[in-house]
Amino acid sequence: GPTTGLLVLIDGHPQYMGLMGHPIADACQSMLADRVEVVRGPASVLYGSNAMGGVINIVTRRMHEDGVKTDLHAGYGSYNTLETEVTNQVRAGRFTSTVTGSYNRTDGHRRNMGFEQYGGYAKLGYRIAQAWDLYADVNLTHFNARNPGSVSEPILDNRQRITRGMTSFALRNDYGWTSGTLSFFYNWGRHRINDGHSPGEEPLNYRFNSRDRMLGVSWYQSVALFRGNRLTVGVDWQHFGGKAWNAFT
């Protein structure tokens, strides 16, 4: 696909469909993000062949000061568009947590262009020692989408039902002059798609189905040997794949 050369990361972990190799943009929701880092241009030396066109790294939320914070966001607009999000963040001593959920929908500006999405995210953290932190998080999203095709070449019954999930664990250290992370991640997806048909043609008698997965372990340690210098060493291992089939109706 055209987006296979752009690598999307969440907290440094790659996010793409394990069979097709492209990112699923709808799985990267704004409710996750504390900030977004962008590497422009080819970065394959550090990130692999998926980074030929650049890298987008989404850094997830966390509380930096003790307290409890709850945010509620809701918006409504044209074409019956609704977006909602609620987030609760806690920091109490060594413990931190972030829990957020969202619901979004729209009818679209054309017939058969509806979209609906549910999402949830949770992240827990604990400071083991002054320079050591442990984190675990999970992200789930499901969306239903319809595609009407182009105005000149419309498509009927083109529907998608897609579920994506992600979980990760990370052990981090930061001594100032040296820092590093040991992490594990596991991503999975379930796709059910009706490719649709042109007006006047018979509806398809099958639905495309797939299950995909991607998992990996990575470690790196960075050290500043002298002023203006930083040396980083690391290693990672990844496995991806899945299964695709047509289910006849």
List PLM regions with ranges.
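Short acidic/polar hinge/loop motifs at secondary-structure boundaries
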Residues: H13-R40
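Transmembrane beta-barrel strands of outer-membrane/channel proteins
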Residues: L72-Y76, V99-Y103, A136-H142, L182-W188, ...
